[in-house]
C-alpha cells in the first residue's frame, strides 16, 4: 500500500506534496517528484525482492499511483513521469533488487503519452502496458499470464493507497471505486486489518 503524490486539496488548495513538488511557476519539479516516489516505493520493492530472492523471484505490478483523482490540475500529465520514475529507480537500484524478475507499470485509464514498451534493466524486465486498468484481473493475474518468463515468480501488486484511509479504503462499506478498494475486494486485506471476516456479495 503506497500513496502516490497528493496534488489536489479542495479545501485549502495545499498539501505537503504540493508544497514539496510544485514550484512558483506551477510546474512539478521532476527531481523532487522522483525523490518522493523513490522513498515511497523503495521499501516495498526491497521487501518484495528480499522475500522472494531465494525462490522464483518477484513480479511486481504498479498502477498509475496518483494519476487519478489526486492528480488535480496535473491529471493526464503524470503517467509519463511515473514511467520515468520507475525506470530511474530500477536503473539506480537494480543491484539492491536482485529478487525482482519483472515490473509491470499500468498507467491507469488515461495512459496519455505513455506508450507500451519493454526494456531490460539489469536482470529486471520492465514493461509498460497501457489500458489494462479496469480489465479483468489487470494487475492480479497469475504471473504466467504476463509472460512465460514469469511463470515461477511470486506476484506482488503495489496498491495506490488513499492517503487518509485504512488499507482497503471504501471496500469496508462495499465500494470498489478505487485501486485500493478493488484490490481489497480481491484479497483478504480487510480481514487481515480487522480480524473480522466479511462476505463479498457485490
Label each PLM-derived region with a short phrase.
Residues 1-202:
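Macrodomain-like recognition of ADP-ribose-binding/processing modules
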Amino acid at each position: 500500500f503506497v500513496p502516490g503524490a497528493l496534488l489536489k486539496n479542495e479545501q485549502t488548495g495545499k498539501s505537503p506534496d504540493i508544497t514539496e513538488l510544485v514550484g512558483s511557476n506551477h510546474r512539478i519539479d521532476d527531481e523532487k517528484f522522483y525523490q518522493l516516489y523513490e522513498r515511497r516505493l523503495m521499501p516495498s520493492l526491497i521487501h518484495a525482492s528480499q522475500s522472494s530472492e531465494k525462490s522464483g523471484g518477484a513480479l511486481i505490478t504498479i498502477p498509475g499511483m496518483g494519476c487519478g483523482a489526486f492528480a488535480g490540475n496535473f491529471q493526464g500529465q503524470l503517467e509519463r513521469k511515473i514511467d520515468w520514475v520507475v525506470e530511474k529507480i530500477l536503473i539506480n537500484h537494480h543491484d539492491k533488487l536482485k529478487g525482482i524478475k519483472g515490473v509491470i507499470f499500468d498507467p491507469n485509464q488515461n495512459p496519455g503519452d505513455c506508450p507500451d514498451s519493454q526494456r531490460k534493466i539489469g536482470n529486471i524486465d520492465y514493461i509498460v502496458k497501457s489500458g489494462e486498468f479496469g480489465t479483468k484481473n489487470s494487475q492480479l493475474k497469475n504471473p504466467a499470464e504476463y509472460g512465460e518468463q514469469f511463470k515461477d515468480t511470486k506476484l506482488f501488486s503495489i496498491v495506490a493507497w488513499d492517503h487518509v484511509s485504512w488499507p482497503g479504503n471504501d471496500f469496508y462499506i462495499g465500494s470498489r471505486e478505487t485501486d485500493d478498494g478493488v484490490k481489497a475486494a480481491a484479497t483478504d486485506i480487510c480481514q487481515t486489518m480487522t480480524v473480522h471476516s466479511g462476505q463479498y456479495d457485490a
